Amino acid sequence: MSQVILDLQLACEDHSGLPEESQFQTWLNAVIPQFQEESEVTIRLVDEAESHDLNLTYRGKDKPTNVLSFPFEAPPGMEMPLLGDLIICRQVVEQEAKEQDKPLEAHWAHMVVHGSLHLLGYDHIEDDEAEEMEALETEIMLALGYEDPYISEKD
């Protein structure tokens, strides 16, 4: 199994308590090589202001969000291993984990898994797409040793 090349960017002001780069690498490697041989992904950890600006600009949502996925589209005739960028907002991830009573590490892992599946073309707009994507997320999270991230929503 091939390994994903990770470019980790720490753009948030406070770096304390963030997952280690090796954890991000593990989470990416649990998802992407199943679908794509050679890949490079940028994960950018940001504060609420940058997340808010990007979410407003690209999704029309006037608030910060947990993870944004920007798939890379190579010009025609050019093959590159760049899969895309994940922008993850530290404060939103931490707040959601607290509100949902989930272990913080597990929620970070889920955001990387969720965002990676978006980079690979998965979506959750339609119900059937959401079911497929959530099933994959659950399978990957369980394989990583975490609980089903949707368990409280299914009860």
Swiss-Prot record:
Stored InterPro entries: MetalPrtase_cat_dom_sf_prd, YbeY, YbeY_CS
Keyword rRNA-binding: no
Gene3D superfamilies: Metalloproteases ('zincins'), catalytic domain
Gene Ontology terms: biological process: rRNA processing
Cofactor(s) this protein requires: Zn(2+)
GO MF entries: metalloendopeptidase activity; RNA endonuclease activity; zinc ion binding
GO cellular component: cytoplasm
Highest taxon in the source lineage: Bacteria
Subcellular location: Cytoplasm
Cofactor note: Binds 1 zinc ion.
Keywords: Cytoplasm, Endonuclease, Hydrolase, Metal-binding, Nuclease, Ribosome biogenesis, rRNA processing, Zinc
EC number(s) stated in the UniProt entry for this protein: 3.1.-.-
Record's keyword annotation contains Translocase: no
HAMAP family attached to this UniProt entry: Endoribonucl_YbeY
Protein family membership: Belongs to the endoribonuclease YbeY family.
Function: Single strand-specific metallo-endoribonuclease involved in late-stage 70S ribosome quality control and in maturation of the 3' terminus of the 16S rRNA.
Record-given protein name: Endoribonuclease YbeY
Organism: Citrobacter koseri (strain ATCC BAA-895 / CDC 4225-83 / SGSC4696)
